[in-house]
Swiss-Prot record:
Pfam families: HEAT_2 (PF13646), Nfu_N (PF08712), Virulence_fact (PF13769)
Species per Swiss-Prot/TrEMBL record: Staphylococcus aureus (strain MRSA252)
Protein name: Conserved virulence factor C
InterPro entries: ARM-like, ARM-type_fold, Nfu/NifU_N, Nfu/NifU_N_sf, PBS_lyase_HEAT, Virulence_F_dom
GO molecular function, one term: oxidoreductase activity
UniProtKB keywords: Virulence
Highest classification ranks of the organism: Bacteria, Bacillati, Bacillota, Bacilli, Bacillales
Gene: cvfC
Superkingdom: Bacteria
Similarity comment text for this entry: Belongs to the CvfC family.
Length: 374
């Protein structure tokens, strides 16, 4: 058994260690102290100074450390527990950092288009929250005696969020209640009871003009417009540019998401506005969009993000430079080699190593998949 990769998680005190071995019993265990009946490698890890607990399931471990402990001291000992060496894994490869550091996936559970529960999933945690009771009541009203709610319910992908998972839940709840106001629930029930509800995209995709958007005073209505917006085109840029100046973070974030759908270098200046937003969630979302587009022209702007106060943003910048960078970015990378966030430091080291070794910049995983299909 050996380590395949080590991935950071949204918690600064937890690392995910992916193993070459998968448990056959499909069970999970949490270990907090050394005991004779535990696997030997678990006891070895628990003996490492600074490790407080280990969660083992399937093919990975979630290793927790004490808040004052340093990952830079702990990780060599974790490697040694599997390889017998302090610096090199048995596979001869350095651990690879995850492509989704800091992401929290947000999903909305719906039945016939009526929402009633939110789920957030991070690398090591899941959090659910039911919408107010009136949403559950209206969802129940939409059922008929022939409906099977288990088979008919659907999870809608709300995209990724960043930050403390409890705070993210508060923000997503606010967004959902704005997108699906209580006043619309009776209409949604009426629509759900119609036979063609499954194929009718009622009230979901509706294009709005710049004038209509500009005349809307309520931020919840503006957010609802953007959430129900069809795939944008160049003609929609003025509207989305206006939304980038909105006082509400969810509106600005959704504007960035929509701008990222316009797959052109001409959209980069607008995404750069997102990189300078006062909200780290908007800055990270803009960085993700730029990473997905994979235009090397964005390198100068992403290099500036290595000085961002938020590590989730600095990490995205370092990851983009790893994906797209060249020797021109080496001075900036080396100037930030001692980043105080271990995950960022590790990604910077990987970028430096890739460039100095002369390895080709392959681009993001998404870009590689796209190129492979051409």
């Amino acid at each position: 058994m050996e380590i395949l990769r080590i991935e950071p998680t949204p918690s600064p005190n937890t690392m995910k260690v992916v193993l070459s071995y998968t448990r056959e019993d499909k069970l999970s265990n949490t270990y907090k102290k050394v005991e004779e009946n535990q696997p030997r490698f678990i006891n070895q890890l628990l003996s490492i100074d600074g490790i407080t607990s280990i969660f083992h399931v399937m093919n990975f471990l979630a290793v927790d450390k004490a808040p004052k402990a340093d990952w830079e001291d702990i990780l060599p000992d974790i490697k040694a527990a599997f390889s017998g060496e302090s610096q090199v894994l048995e596979s001869g490869k350095d651990p690879q950092i995850d492509n989704h550091f800091g992401e929290i996936k947000a999903e909305l559970l719906t039945f016939k288009g009526i929402p009633y529960q939110i789920k957030l999933t991070s690398a090591d945690q899941e959090l659910r929250e039911q919408l107010p009771q009136t949403y559950v009541d209206h969802m129940t009203q939409a059922q008929t005696k022939h409906d099977n709610i288990v088979f008919m319910r659907k999870w809608l992908d709300l995209g990724n969020r960043y930050g403390n998972i409890e705070e993210v839940m508060d923000g997503v709840l606010e967004e959902v209640l704005a997108t699906y106001p209580e006043s619309q629930l009776p209409v949604l029930v009426k629509h759900a009871l119609e036979e063609n509800h499954a194929t009718n995209n009622y009230h979901f995709y509706r294009h709005v003009s710049l004038d209509e958007y500009h005349a809307t005073d309520n931020w919840k209505t503006r957010l609802r417009m953007l959430n129900h917006f069809p795939k944008p085109t160049f003609e929609d840029i003025p509207l989305l540019d206006l939304a980038l100046s909105d006082e509400k973070v969810p509106v600005r974030r959704q504007a960035i998401v929509l701008l990222g759908m316009i797959e052109s270098k001409e959209i980069l200046p607008y995404l750069y506005k997102g990189l300078r937003d006062k909200s780290p969630a908007v800055r990270r979302t803009a960085g993700d969009c730029i990473s997905d587009l994979g235009y090397p022209e964005a390198l100068p702007e992403m290099v500036l993000l290595l000085d961002d106060p938020q590590k989730i943003v600095r990490w995205r910048a370092a990851m983009f430079i790893f994906d797209e960078g060249n020797a021109e970015q080496l001075p900036a990378l080396k100037a930030h080699i001692n980043d105080n966030a271990f995950e960022v430091k590790l990604q910077i080291e990987m970028a430096i190593s890739r460039i100095e070794n002369g390895d080709e910049a392959l681009g993001s995983v998404w870009k590689q998949m796209t190129n492979r299909t051409i």
